[in-house]
Amino acid sequence: VAASGQLKSIAVGLLKIANDLRWLGSGPRAGIGEITLPEVQPGSSIMPGKVNPVIAESVAMVSAQVIGNDTTIAIAGQSGNFELNVMMPVAAHNLLESIDLLSTSAVNFAHQCVNGLEATGKGPEMVMQGLTIGTALAPIIGYDVAAGIVHEASVSGENIREVALRMTDLTEEQLDEILEPLSMTEPKA
C-alpha cells in the first residue's frame, strides 16, 4: 500500500508537469504559447494543421490509471482478515502495472516531449506587457500608487512602464532597474 502511494505521488507530479506543458504550449494563435512542444503526431481530428500534445496527454492517461490502481490497492490492503488477504493478487497486479506504466511513460515523456521543448518569443513579451510586473513598484512608490498604476495599465492597455513614467517622478533609467524581471527572481535583504 505504501509503495503504491509513492507511485501515486509520482503520477500526480508527472500529471501536473504534463498539464503545465500542455497549457504553456497551447496555441498557435490562441492560448499561452510560451513553448513549442515536439510534433510527434501530425494533425488534429477537429482542427486541420493543429498539432496535439499527445505525449503529455498520454502521461495524463497513465497518471489517471496509476491513481486508480492506488485506490484498488488501498481497498485490497484494508480487505484482509487477520493474517489472510484474498485480495493480494489484485494488489500485486495493480502495483506491477503501475510500476510498468510509470517507468515507460516517464522515459517516453522525457525523450519525446521534454527533450524537444523550445521556448518561443512570447514569454519575455508577456512579462513586460503583463500587469504582475507592477508589484515591483510597491516597495518604491507605495502599494496604493502601484495599485493605481496597475489599474490604469489594465484599463488603458498601456504597459506598466509607460503608465509609471506618466504617473510618477521615476526616470526611465530607474524604471528599467526596478522593472527588470530577473531582479525579481532573487531575494532582497
Where are these regions (language model features)?
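Acidic, glycine-rich loop-and-beta core segments that form the ion-binding/anion-interacting portion
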Residues: V1-I35
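Catalytic-core signal marking the mid-to-C-terminal active-site face
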Residues: N19, S26-A189
